[in-house]
């Protein structure tokens, strides 16, 4: 009998917590709510450079129900994408202790009539500890940070795109 009462109390407590969380507006990050006219998109990247952001952005767009294909109504053009690395701090022997990584992306969104509706420059930055004795580990960490920055930038682009008001015909 006591065991049944404990389970019932736990169920009531769990239900109350869920209600409180939903009442305050909390929700898990899920797919973006995209207006129907925005669900078709042409994605263009600079021809001369191999974009590291493009495959990440394409996967994210498609995962959120946006068909990425040539000739679609809206156009998202990555104008430029620049990665950089600089020394952030130096140690006592003038050795590099930290590097600062950054990725800067400039993009534009055009409506089906070719009118610009959104143009932004986004920046993602990370700093990491560098150890010259562990070069391979530092290189792997740098590569992982660039991947995280690409994901961050792709999410920002998606949020900005999802908040657009569709053009009225």
PLM region descriptions:
Residues 2-13:
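Bacterial N-terminal signal peptides that target proteins for export
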Residues 20-23:
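C-terminal motif of bacterial Sec signal peptides marking the signal peptidase cleavage site
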Residues 25-28:
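Bacterial signal peptide processing site
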Residues 32-33:
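Hydrophobic ligand-binding cavity/cleft-lining segments
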Residues 36-81:
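N-terminal segment of the mature soluble domain
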Residues 61-65, 109-113, 132, 156-165:
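Sec/Tat-exported extracytoplasmic proteins
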Residues 74-121, 127-143:
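Surface-exposed short loop/turn segments
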Residues 136-169:
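C-terminal/domain-edge helix-coil "capping" segments
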